[in-house]
Amino acid sequence: MGIVSVLLFVMSIALVVVTLPLLVELLVLTGAALLPSDSEKANVNGKNSAVGFRLAVIVPAHNEEALIGRCVCSILASRPQFVEVLVVAHNCSDNTAVEAERAGARVLRLNESSQSGKGCALHHGFLTALAEGFDAVLVIDADSVVSTNLVEAARNSFRSGSQAVQCRYEMLAATSNRRGQLMSLAFMGFNVIRPAGRERLGLSAGIFGNGFGMRREVLEQLPYEARSTTEDLEYHLMLVDAGIRVAFLDSAHVASEAPASSSGASTQRERWEGGRFRMMKQWTPRLLVRVLSGNFRALEPLLDLLGLPLALEVGLLTVALCLPVEWLRFYAVAALALIGLHVLVAAAKGPDFRGAMKALVTAPFYILWKLWMLPRIWRASRADAPWVRTSRDASV
């Protein structure tokens, strides 16, 4: 066997090893998401089943005066008699607190210049809710709007036995910008299709930073002390490690603004994907030990953590398709077909199937943009990487 053959063999094995975790995830979860489910009906329909159950909605906010009023009004339109909205105005230099109070929220002012990031604001809000005797908390981002059944669905799910919940999390109506439409499509796959599949299989749905909540017993057992740039993923891994399952509420949704600019989109991607790489380095050994010890419920979170970003996955599979190795080409074709099916299912679940299909024409440019960002994403995976807020569209 010549040196070229050896190199091709090593490259082929490496490509399979790094791309296989995501493919297994997509195959299992996309297939499961297509199965019918009646699990939520009991949780959502009983209008009086959650009487007396106190729910606090925590809204972390840093200089969100343009959007906080809309957010609070949206929450209070969803069964206002059963919820109290606590806005944590964290290191604000604008009128966020004034606008939140005007809309009907109670404001918790938190000014700690040495503490930045969403995790710090959430920790403060959760401590307040626990001290005041609330039965559960729900987190809504300041740039979001919620469905009118969200509060009732969350409360009933908690009363039905759920320890933690994640509502369906979408982007607000996609813009005419093709990259924005592709991001919305990727959002649908990651935040809707995959957790729906996990719910069908009885697995923990995941936490996506917006529209999630926990009972007070969970917070007392596992205080929210996650401080990474992806504190939601970090806390979910802590929940999984403790054997706590997050239920997925597909019928109740929260929708947030897409990044207003190219720089905002880049900042958001750096934070999310850099944070995921950091969690991969930190948690993979621990989850692997759990799996090897016979805890097979840790296998799916491990595969999820090892799964590459979809754009990078497609890029590597394209490389595999170009290599002169027959079995690897067959693998790449089958893998790309599976990804195509996943994308079609995500598009069908979204609000604009035709627009999503048109946006896919520009997918190669989106993939190149993601590959160009890899060095910045890797820098964002460092333990000392700062939490950088995504810029908002002030015209909303």
Where are the regions that the model predicts?
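A conserved acidic beta->alpha catalytic loop
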Residues: 74, 89-97, 112-114, 145
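Cell-envelope/extracellular polymer assembly enzymes that use nucleotide-activated donors
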Residues: 54-56, 84, 234
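N-proximal low-complexity "stem/linker" segments adjacent to membrane-targeting elements
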Residues: 1-73
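Short, acidic, metal-binding catalytic loop of nucleotide-sugar glycosyltransferases
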Residues: 73-82
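Acidic helix N-cap motif at the loop->helix transition within catalytic regions
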Residues: 69-70, 94-102, 109, 149
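Membrane-embedded multi-pass helical conduit in multi-pass membrane proteins
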Residues: 24, 31-35, 39, 49, ...
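Long helical/loop segments within the catalytic core of UDP-sugar-dependent glycosyltransferases
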Residues: 111, 115-125, 129-134, 148-149, ...
